[in-house]
Amino acid sequence: MFLEKLKLLNSIFEEVESKLSDLSVISNQEEYRELTKQHFYLRPLAEKYIRYSKLLNEIKDAEELQKSKDAEMKEIAFAEYNNLIEKRNQMENEIKVLLIPTDPNEDKNIIVEIRAGTGGNEAALFVGDLYGMYTRFAERNGWKYEVLGSNPTGLGGYKEVVFEINGGKVWRCFKFERGAHRVQRVPETEASGRVHTSAATVAVLPEAEEVDVEIKMEDLRIDTYRASGAGGQHINKTDSAIRITHLPTGLVVACQDERSQIKNRAKAFKVLRAKIYEQRILEHEMRLSSERKQQIGSGDRSEKIRTYNFPQNRITDHRIGYSVYNITEVMDGNLSELVNKLIKADIESKLKENNI
């Protein structure tokens, strides 16, 4: 099965490689870009085809040597055969993963939006905790981040915070964070020691380039106003804050963190483009309802994905039914264990979905 499929993909790879050296193709940017994507996806599979074919031949040779009448030779051949079978099984698992259709957002940077849900001040504090967890996770991985917009409460929390993270594989690691996060803990102001439940929603948007989303100026309403800090007091004497409304979709983005209107405008456009791109992706996924059922989480902000129970020192991811008991470490940015479990579960569901 694998050999025939790899043989076919290898022939397609050779055809794509040939086209990429054709001057008429090189001059056609759209076709060249599409072929480059195919080449990027097929190259590892073509390399596996060569190695896998060679490995199967080595297994055949080891099988023949096991028929030897020489007892010592037979023993060596048997050990070699078992070793090669183990290598084959490992390589087949690697091939399965490579056969999964590539995520078009795999190499994109991201914009993360965290909003306070039910729970008042506790929910706002939880937004701050999640922001700290994600930015420390970014630091651990050498990724850069920058705040694009925030609405602080003045109590160390946020009604909302929006920030971008740039670096390799950020989308792969963060895309499973989309949804509703619930926290259970005793607030510092709670004299009776009663556990309160609060929530925050997280949206993770792949950063869209101009080639991904075209925004027409006639589709926008742009308002300017004075930036305000916690409590509503004005912190700038000029109308530096920006609010952009995308009329066709009704999406609204506001940015006031920078003192410069130009910088706020640039940040707002970046977030708006990502939101429009996300909306298109979700509409496409909705049309593929059977696919959504197979995936680890729908990406819907209202879907409850995780509970952070501080009294029990436990974090539970409800999509995969997995719990960790090191809440302090996780909140300090040590998300790798949870992320790796989610990636593994996602791969398994996609293998099943694609009959691989």
Swiss-Prot record:
Keywords: Cytoplasm, Methylation, Protein biosynthesis. GO terms for molecular function: translation release factor activity, codon specific. Pfam families: PCRF, RF-1. Methylated by PrmC. Methylation increases the termination efficiency of RF1. Gene3D superfamilies: 3.30.160.20, 3.30.70.1660, 6.10.140.1950. One of its GO terms (cellular component) is cytoplasm. Coiled coil: none annotated. It comes from the Bacteria. It is found in: Cytoplasm. Belongs to the prokaryotic/mitochondrial release factor family. Peptide chain release factor 1 directs the termination of translation in response to the peptide chain termination codons UAG and UAA. This is Peptide chain release factor 1. It comes from Endomicrobium trichonymphae. The lineage of its organism: Bacteria, Pseudomonadati, Elusimicrobiota, Endomicrobiia, Endomicrobiales. The gene is prfA.
